[in-house]
């Protein structure tokens, strides 16, 4: 191809190693604008050359004189030789090209500003196949590009904390294969436009920005085009700054203490701080008979401060040995960082030994009087209640009738659940029918065989074909035992398989029976899925109610992961015992993927779990994850949320804020719990929010705190966790999206990528219980702090004559 400018001729040669890229002619409108920006020439059009990533580019400028040497420019900037770029007298050669090599190239004589040639180079992962001459040979499916995964592009607004990684995707297809480039706020976006650079993964149609900052906010548009046209899609990015904060001190610590003279005293102070805190213990003193200075600040002495060999954990405890009366007074824990200071105070009261004994004696007398008085009042109250009950008690026949009426209000009807049932029973048939009651009074049903359920031929199993075995565990209203069942597999009626059998305890109530029946019916209607515990059958006739479900030999996921922690680490249960099997990173991703699939199925059946956690996921012999415990599950076919009305035990550390504070349960609140379950998986069964008391957790969640990334978790997976923990429920991903994301991660993960277990898991140790345990500050914090509260703090202290004034 030749183009003439006056008497000068330019020859452009383009060659690629391994494959010859195609050249496509662009219109004068687009190319001419770029030429005018960088070049002083009268070019009528630009020639665009398309190369594949990794190819070699060769551009040549020919002049009438063979002795003329030329300079080369890219986007108006001179090109210097490098290990990839070779410059000859008239030749420019670039090897192993990448997307960053795309741009406008020009050549000029060494002693002239006259442009001899210019070329537009675009580098893609998949170069276009064919020249304009080949258009007639293209298939009938040619046309404008199209989106291949529009469902992955529905979330247009992305709000992330600063320092996170952001990934935008625009999966597309077309014939000829389209190319993609990106705009920010309407202008072309390249790596040099951002301090941290960008990653353009053309095969995945994605733009990746690591460690985002507030200046990255804006609208990002992907433009996908081929010669038939283009399509575009815009994402909006909002980067949230992490607010710096002064330390947070746990409420109630240090606590007031009263001791006898000569005792030893410990004051505790729990500090939470994003930045490294500086902790001091102060004692309030008097100077010239006054506790406060002229400016109103208290006089204090420093009892304990950071030293060369002290740790934050040591500084959180103040020890006083063999206290005297002079030690009585006010003590303050002062914690500060680069942002500010926070403090909590407590009083120490020191009593003489005899006074404390007198107090104990007088206290014993008062306690005795109080206990006797309380006992007398309770006795009289019980006596009155018994008399009233006997006065109102009818004859035996009337009593039986009344009891039957009371319990007959209990039977459930299938019409109460709006899910479509596959059961063969009539929709109005009561699930429980009363036949007779024992003579025992009260609502306790010690002999549950006195309640009959109509048989369901599809699920009924004769008791003679069931052999009960060892207990497996106990639930809220019943127990689970292992059993051998014959006839579960209809194709092999004589084959025995191992099952788990749910049954009521001996002291079960009618409400307990209602819950078990409801769970059985729910499992019937939800149907079967590989990643949930499925119903296998039931024994409802001639005896207690038995519900047969799948048996998972490896127990729950939490214990499964903990049993496979490596030996020799301080977080391993038994350092002498080798783990049962070594887990790879892909094994952990597979666990998460399977649970997500099970939850996707439950969500499709309009079922909200409300108690999703690793302890409620069971593992089979073949390492298949199965979601269990539908006891808290509820049908929400007609409504999209469920408000809990009872005050039963709730798994607060797995609960979404809207469920925790407003008792509103949706599929999005299950997604939050799934994020916590992901954290459990990648800490090999760690306890969420280790060392954080429940009361403190409420406050921290309201302030936007989230758990930090586990040591063996990739940044992409941690981003999935953080998306699950979005404060706005509607901004969390759906389980369908989670399945797709985890499937992608699973596909890209190596099968032999073993965990880097050289990093200790101190903050995920089993010692970190879910109750009121301690937590160190600084690097041991499990929180990523977003927004934090204002707290009163002491002014910065200054030395004053050997006494610290604050």
UniProtKB/Swiss-Prot annotation:
SUPFAM superfamilies: Immunoglobulin, Protein kinase-like (PK-like). It comes from the Eukaryota. Residues 390-806 are cytoplasmic. The modification Phosphotyrosine is found at residues 641-642, 718, 754. Residues 121-146 are annotated as: Disordered. It is a single-pass type I membrane protein. InterPro entries: FGF_rcpt_fam, Ig-like_dom, Ig-like_dom_sf, Ig-like_fold, Ig_I-set, Ig_sub, Ig_sub2, Immunoglobulin_dom. Autophosphorylated. Binding of FGF family members together with heparan sulfate proteoglycan or heparin promotes receptor dimerization and autophosphorylation on tyrosine residues. Autophosphorylation occurs in trans between the two FGFR molecules present in the dimer. One of its GO terms (biological process) is fibroblast growth factor receptor signaling pathway. It is found in: Cell membrane. Residues 24-124, 150-238, 247-349 form the Ig-like C2-type domain. Its EC number is 2.7.10.1. Glycans are attached at residues 83, 96, 118, 219, 256, 288, 309, 322. ATP binds at residues 472-480, 502. It catalyses: L-tyrosyl-[protein] + ATP = O-phospho-L-tyrosyl-[protein] + ADP + H(+). Residues 20-364 are extracellular. It is an enzyme of class 2 (transferase). It holds the Pfam family Ig_3. Residues 466-755 form the Protein kinase domain. Monomer. Homodimer after ligand binding. The second and third Ig-like domains directly interact with fibroblast growth factors (FGF) and heparan sulfate proteoglycans. Belongs to the protein kinase superfamily. Tyr protein kinase family. Fibroblast growth factor receptor subfamily. This is Fibroblast growth factor receptor 3. It comes from Gallus gallus. The gene is FGFR3.
